[in-house]
Structures are given as C-alpha cells and as structure tokens.
A protein has these predicted regions:
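Long, charged, low-complexity intrinsically disordered regions
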Residues: 1-42, 50-105
C-alpha cells in the first residue's frame, strides 16, 4: 500500500476537495473537512512529516465521533516526497492521504 513519489512541494496543486494539515488547532481542520464534505462527495486529507498523526486524528474524529453523519475512510495512501532542506540536502519526507467519503448505505 505504500508508494514513493519523487516530487517537490512546489509541484503540488490544490484542488477544491483537499485539506492540507498543518499546525492549526485540530478542530479547525475537522470543521474545514466537514464544510467540504457538505459540498463534495469525498475529501482528501493530506499531511507530511510531523503532521501525519494530526491528519489521522482529523479523519478518526469525523468517522468515529460524528458517526451519525455517515462518513467513512474510503482509502489511505502512504508515500514520501524528496524535499530540499535549507542546508541544501535532499531529504525524504513521509506523506499520507486519507480519503473520507459519505457512506452509500
């Protein structure tokens, strides 16, 4: 289930159904994801490096705590990106993409 992507952060483009996880409070991302899910059939939660546990938390809060809304984890993609650090070295940074969608039942 893991794949390796050799891209840099500058090549990424944001589509309307993607949520990028950063350093903001957890519930900020939960709210943003729920707003997107109201308009889209599925949303992809993306994170890199130290933000990966926060992305998993966001997905689990939506699926488990808000089970009355009927959302599920559709897929999980793991990978890595080659990123140039400030000192000029190339480092591999782990990535995760969690797709959350509505239950069809």
């Amino acid at each position: 289930m893991s794949s390796k992507n050799e891209t840099t952060g500058s090549n990424r483009s944001k589509s309307s159904n993607e949520i990028f996880i950063g350093k903001k409070p957890l519930m900020t991302y939960v709210t943003a994801t729920l707003v997107q899910l109201a308009n889209e059939p599925s949303v992809v939660i993306k994170a890199r490096g130290k933000s990966i546990p926060r992305a998993v938390d966001v997905a689990q809060i939506i699926v488990k705590r808000m089970d009355t809304l009927g959302y599920k984890v559709a897929s999980v993609k793991l990978g890595s990106e080659a990123v140039k650090s400030q000192d000029g070295n190339t480092r591999n940074v782990s990535t995760i993409e969690v797709a959350v969608s509505r239950n069809s039942t």
